[in-house]
Amino acid sequence: MTTTTSSIQDSSAAHTQNNTQPNDSTGTNTAAKNSAHVPLRVIIDNLSTNEGEVEIGVYTPENKFPDEKDKFKKYRFQPKSEQIDVLLEDLPYGELALAVYHDENNNGKIDKNFLGIPTEPYAFSNNFKPSFKAPSFDNCKFSYNEQNHVVRISLLNKRKPTK
């Protein structure tokens, strides 16, 4: 297992990728095998501020969704407006789920109240809105492939957007 950290710029956000890449049964790094894939385009809207960073956690069926410590990969972006539009590369085709939060105070974690409910804006793929418990992978999964490679997510905000 290798860990890599890289930083790139795109037109909509500063991007930092921190991930762990598993090897497949042949010992080949799966990210290298998947590098020819169409990137996953993620459009996130309803950001209330440009402060902090937006974190996207990517989960496969093998991960404990939405466990913050068991992500397949994570990406962090500096928002420049009320929406970010980013490309996530080196992901395997198949079923994935995304957990997103806006780390407004940039402390590297999602802040929660005494009940464990997030106090910073957050969202999940399929725009699943949890009620009294965390969502399951099945609630948020989608099929990522060459034909299906765009995901739109609206953050659940705790306050009104500022202009």
Regions found by a protein language model. Name each.
Residues 102-104, 157:
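Surface-exposed loop/turn motifs at beta-strand-loop junctions within extracellular Ig-like
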Residues 49, 80, 92-93:
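Surface-exposed loops/turns
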Residues 3-59, 112-163:
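Primarily secretory-pathway and cell-envelope proteins
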Residues 104-112:
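Acidic, glycine-anchored loop motifs typical of Ca2+
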Residues 96-100:
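A short tyrosine-centered beta-strand micro-motif
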Residues 83-90:
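Exposed aromatic-hydrophobic patches
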Residues 57-75:
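Short amphipathic beta-strand segments in non-cytosolic proteins
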Residues 76-82, 144-145:
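Short proline/glycine- and polar residue-rich coil/turn motifs
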